[in-house]
Amino acid sequence: MNVLKSSLLAAAAVWLSAGASVAQAQVRITEIAPWASASSTPYQTDWFELTNFGDTAVNLTGWSMDDNSNGSAKVALTGITSIAAGESVIFTETAASAAFLSTWFGDQAPLGLQIGNYTGKGVGLSQSGDAVNLYNASGELHASLTFGSSEGLTQTFDNSAGLNHTSVSQLSVSGVNGAFAAVNDLVEIGSPGAIAAAVPEPQSYALLLAGLGVFGIIARKRQR
């Protein structure tokens, strides 16, 4: 192998590594039910869903959340230590996993669906409009979604697209993005633990393809 080829391969490896790192920590807030604690739901607790759109598992140890107080009252996420690539997990405000699973799935809960908790003063999700802010182990804001009034609603806010640092208003509709009516509470509509296939964000692929293209051009020019 000549020096040129060796250099190109080394550079390509660095570029590919950089591209992969872009996708590794793409955890997004993909569903929110801010009405669940104030309504007549059997489990009586608000909840939200996180989805890993990256290409490797993400360690959630030390991660935390807050509502629209933006970090001043943040509390730890507990009960889940890792979220696999493509996996969606649920966090409820109180420990109500058994009632939650029974309400949504009856006795057919998805195998391996993870449910964690967040508990503390000042982090209840308001029906008049609020936010979910997600912080990584370094205390940095990693993902956030705001939402408007949910008074009178029994459909979750649906962010299956994985949008970040924005507002969500789309409501879950049965048959769309995996949404369904809860087995034991038919007025509730959502898709806890299931969204369209999570894949690395487009910019990751664009970066990888661009890098390979650049190295290919350089190699051809050197060979002339």
Residue ranges and their predicted role:
Residues V3-S6, A137, S160, H165, ...:
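N-terminal cationic leader/targeting segments used for protein routing and processing
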Residues S7-L8, A18, V22, T103, ...:
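Compositionally biased regions
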Residues S6-L9, E31, I218:
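Short helix-onset patch at the extreme N-terminus, typifying the N->h transition
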Residues G62, G86, G129, G190-G193, ...:
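Glycine-centered flexibility sites
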Residues G216-R224:
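C-terminal membrane-anchoring or membrane-association module
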Residues S169-A198:
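A recurrent domain-boundary module in secreted/ectodomain proteins
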Residues Q24-S167:
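Activation on beta-sandwich/Ig-like modules and their edge loops
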Residues V3-A13, A18-Q26, A194-L212:
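Short, threonine-centered small-residue motifs that mark membrane-proximal processing/anchoring sites
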